[in-house]
């Protein structure tokens, strides 16, 4: 039987599209269907390494996990990784093809649509149902010409659309009805139903609201979804979902993660954030590093040189010196590791104008940004105490120097990575995902004088996906969604 497909678009960003697709993927998988998540175009600096050696957005990685399928580049054929306010790195079917400003990217879309459709039909060849996620807002009609992410894709494949609105931010009736009003008639005709997400309170109080939306739009009402509190236990992809700073705990070690403007792969700190024995918070620019922090983490960055400038502008370079004088620890990961060195050179202009900038000088290393990108899963041991680890590499650049002769990690193939200085007080490496390894996380927390919960992070994510699936089974008419799904139009 040919695969069917249905698309989920939103009235705006952060309405819950990714989470709903993940929950439906798990629910339908538990029903015995072979599910494929798909997002034509994603914009995110949080990415995952796929089984076929490329990269996709973290949301699609979670959706693949929910569907219990190996990740493939075909689940997210176009990934945009913002490097500035007007430009992004463009990744097509898992491979970097270059950088483009927003205006130039528009001209690339006809060719990108070919890659999108190629990946989509490759993916559904061995699938019962494809759950397609749109991007941003369906109502951005200024971007409709050449669109590959929302209605442009839906029209090309002739698959029905479910529109999702977020009641938590207010104005959900206007956002749903208003979307229909601004869409071209042929695009609006593809919307078959709607969902209202993130409801809080008594659902009976919004029954008339659901009826009003259905009456005005003539769309099928598919469900009013209460807020899912455990969403915080799942990896977030967008910086919109990045937890803000709060009141620090008085009796737990404090871990401060510097959230510079182009922070990347920040979901790798979720396993630490969920541990009761520590208090991990992301610090926005303008928030000082607390004087009694146990560890300051410099995370990955999609624009290392620009984020290093932002770090200095925030005064964090001065805070780091004071932190080290008080005996605190510093850990740099990927771009954060590069920042810890003496110099970052970009001779070919991968991040902007060619040039070089001074680093923080906390590690005796220098980095040269190169065009080659390392993308691989890795494992090995820490050099200081032989603790095993698993993680992944996702970076450009070569780093070397005297401090690299004292590496932080040794891979199972004998390669070395990172650097350690000041008796272990300062360390850095290129490897992401270290803290998802339960054994390494427990080992690292013992070094802070606290203990891990003993829970498996992977098992916790899977249990949360099961709970999300049960939540959606209760509040969404999933049978009706299956009825609405259609066989996509073949593209020749």
Swiss-Prot record:
The lineage of its organism: Bacteria, Pseudomonadati, Pseudomonadota, Alphaproteobacteria, Hyphomicrobiales. GO terms for molecular function: ABC-type vitamin B12 transporter activity; catalytic activity. Pathway: Cofactor biosynthesis; adenosylcobalamin biosynthesis. Signal peptide: none annotated. It comes from the Bacteria. GO terms for biological process: cobalamin biosynthetic process. Pfam families: CbiA, GATase_3. SUPFAM superfamilies: Class I glutamine amidotransferase-like (SSF52317), P-loop containing nucleoside triphosphate hydrolases (SSF52540). Belongs to the CobB/CobQ family. CobQ subfamily. Catalyzes amidations at positions B, D, E, and G on adenosylcobyrinic A,C-diamide. NH(2) groups are provided by glutamine, and one molecule of ATP is hydrogenolyzed for each amidation. This is Cobyric acid synthase. The gene is cobQ. The active site is at 334 (nucleophile), 432. Residues 252-440 form the GATase cobBQ-type domain. The keyword DNA-binding does not apply. Keywords: Cobalamin biosynthesis, Glutamine amidotransferase. The keyword Coiled coil does not apply.
